[in-house]
């Protein structure tokens, strides 16, 4: 009879969790930041608020965003005007839209990741699904498993209402699953739709207005597994370590409250300072074991909470401008898609490395860091190791 220790050892994988494929998707409806103030004040029937519109236009101009993809259309707002009001009861219709559309958008990204991976979907053993909104039972994980036709035995983890740091959370979770279950292949999906947070403007809620200028919709999927079969699987990044911490006395710095009016968004003005003053401690804890203290020697996947956060981190760590190029590119092209952002940036990083004929998936560098920032104020830190670039 095998001992508990023998059984335990047999269950463990031998090598580190590795990202084996990435897929991304967005809604079809695209809005451009240059004229978004006109669009937003029109669809929310707020054109009489001329001074607030000027202020919102300045926020949009400073956002460093070129365009975003948003599921909510003008026609939908005409049909459901309470969504476009500032504080009107509207949770029921928001929920109806979200619970249907979040799994569908997640499916689009998942199918792209599965196609790149190239293996039968029956080999997916675990599913980790993350979204900020649309809580119900059974959840979006169950719906996605059915939409994709995954095995009924797939082991599911559903993460709701984590917020912008959760792109790091899902990778940390997938790492633990892959490394503690030999042969596991974990499908990770982040699907974010801003229907729950969209609302009209108010003079008394400028933090809400900032959110309306920054957030976009998108979904991203990755497949994670240990001990890849390199004859049929192509490793992209290894997940070396993963940690989470929260900054003391900052519980309200980034907050969301779900009420009958939807999810209201609250932001302290000093969030960029809070993050930038605490990020080096996270870096040191993660990289001291590797003997790394030069932050410019890393490739960077940082959640693009907004240009002010990126600027503050860049200045505090004396980062070269090119270090956050992939992050700024995703912010410009898609806005802040909450948990999905860092996975979009991972995708951009490996594509950019291929196009630039770099030696590794991390822009030619070996080591990298992935950061998620969000409510709590919570910071997720994932240490990445790139792999040699393979061209077909």
Swiss-Prot record:
InterPro entries: Chalcone/stilbene_synt_C, Chalcone/stilbene_synt_N, Chalcone/stilbene_synthase_AS, Polyketide_synthase_type-III, Thiolase-like. The active site is at 164. Keywords: Acyltransferase, Cytoplasm, Plant defense, Stress response, Transferase. It catalyses: 4-coumaroyl-CoA + 3 malonyl-CoA + 3 H(+) = trans-resveratrol + 4 CO2 + 4 CoA. Signal peptide: none annotated. GO terms for cellular component: cytoplasm. This is Stilbene synthase 5. Its EC number is 2.3.1.95. GO terms for biological process: biosynthetic process; defense response. Belongs to the thiolase-like superfamily. Chalcone/stilbene synthases family. The keyword Membrane does not apply. One of its GO terms (molecular function) is trihydroxystilbene synthase activity. It is found in: Cytoplasm. Mediates resistance to pathogens which are sensitive to stilbenes. Pathway: Phytoalexin biosynthesis; 3,4',5-trihydroxystilbene biosynthesis; 3,4',5-trihydroxystilbene from trans-4-coumarate: step 2/2. The keyword Transferase applies. It is an enzyme of class 2 (transferase). It comes from Vitis vinifera (Grape). Homodimer. Substrate binds at residues 55-58, 267, 305-307.
């Amino acid at each position: 009879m095998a001992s508990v220790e023998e059984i335990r050892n047999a269950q463990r994988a031998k090598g580190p969790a590795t990202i084996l494929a990435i897929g991304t998707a967005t809604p079809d409806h695209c809005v451009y930041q240059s004229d978004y103030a006109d669009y937003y004040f029109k669809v929310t029937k707020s054109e009489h608020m001329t001074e607030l519109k000027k202020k919102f236009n300045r926020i949009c101009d400073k956002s460093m965003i070129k365009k975003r993809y948003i599921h909510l259309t003008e026609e939908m707002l005409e049909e459901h005007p309470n969504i476009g009001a500032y504080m009107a009861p509207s949770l029921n219709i928001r929920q109806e839209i979200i619970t249907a559309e979040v799994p569908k958008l997640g499916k689009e990204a998942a199918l792209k990741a599965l196609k790149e991976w190239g293996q039968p979907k029956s080999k997916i053993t675990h599913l980790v699904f993350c979204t900020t909104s649309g809580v119900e039972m059974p959840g979006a994980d169950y719906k996605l498993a059915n939409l994709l036709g995954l095995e009924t035995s797939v082991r599911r983890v559903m993460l709701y209402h984590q917020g912008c740091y959760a792109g790091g959370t899902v990778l940390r979770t997938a790492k633990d699953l892959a490394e503690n279950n030999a042969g596991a292949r974990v499908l990770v999906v982040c699907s974010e739709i801003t229907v729950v947070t969209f609302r009209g403007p108010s003079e008394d809620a400028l933090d809400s207005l900032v959110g309306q200028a920054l957030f976009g919709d998108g979904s991203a999927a990755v497949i994670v597994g240990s001990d890849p079969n390199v004859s049929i699987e192509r490793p992209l990044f290894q997940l070396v370590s993963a940690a989470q911490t929260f900054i003391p006395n900052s519980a309200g710095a980034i907050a969301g409250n779900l009420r009958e009016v939807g999810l209201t968004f609250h932001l302290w003005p000093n969030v960029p300072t809070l993050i930038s003053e605490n990020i080096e401690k996270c870096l040191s804890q993660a990289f001291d074991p590797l003997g790394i203290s030069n932050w410019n020697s890393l490739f960077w996947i940082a959640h693009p909470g907004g240009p002010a956060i990126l600027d503050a981190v860049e200045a505090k760590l004396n980062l070269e401008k090119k270090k956050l190029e992939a992050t700024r590119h995703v912010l410009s092209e898609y806005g802040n898609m909450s948990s999905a952002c860092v996975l979009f940036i991972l995708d951009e990083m490996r594509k950019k490395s291929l196009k630039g004929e770099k030696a590794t998936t991390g822009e030619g560098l070996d080591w990298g860091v992935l950061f998620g920032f969000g409510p709590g104020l919570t910071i997720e830190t994932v240490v990445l190791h790139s792999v040699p670039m393979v061209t077909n």
